[in-house]
């Protein structure tokens, strides 16, 4: 039986977590990016758990960028996730954007 969209996303997040724990940051970044960019084939594929997996991947990727001081990548992440928000509840969208904005402001290399 084929994996569902949600199972695929959840599996990739787990793989990325493992890569990050093993200090394979480059691999973790790629996997988190794949989760964020992966589009649902059908609207019903975008379950609450699939949205949660994308949200978790976004936060974890943002934290990697913050830890590494990658200001431009963090700003680009904010721009690249905008298409996701079509499917997200407005409250979740606001929370994610506020969190990413706050992370960006906390970076040392960010000019205000």
List the predicted regions and their residue ranges.
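Extended alpha-helical scaffold regions
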Residues: 1-112
């Amino acid at each position: 039986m084929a994996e569902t969209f949600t199972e695929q996303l959840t599996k990739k997040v787990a793989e990325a977590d493992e890569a990050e724990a093993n200090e394979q940051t480059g691999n973790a970044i790629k996997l988190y990016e794949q989760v964020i960019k992966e589009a649902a084939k059908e609207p019903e594929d975008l379950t609450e758990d699939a949205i949660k997996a994308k949200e978790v991947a976004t936060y974890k990727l943002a934290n990697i960028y913050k830890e590494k001081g990658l200001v431009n990548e963090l700003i680009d992440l904010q721009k690249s996730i905008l298409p996701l928000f079509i499917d997200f509840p407005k409250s979740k969208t606001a929370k994610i954007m506020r969190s990413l904005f706050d992370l960006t402001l906390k970076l040392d290399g960010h000019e205000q």
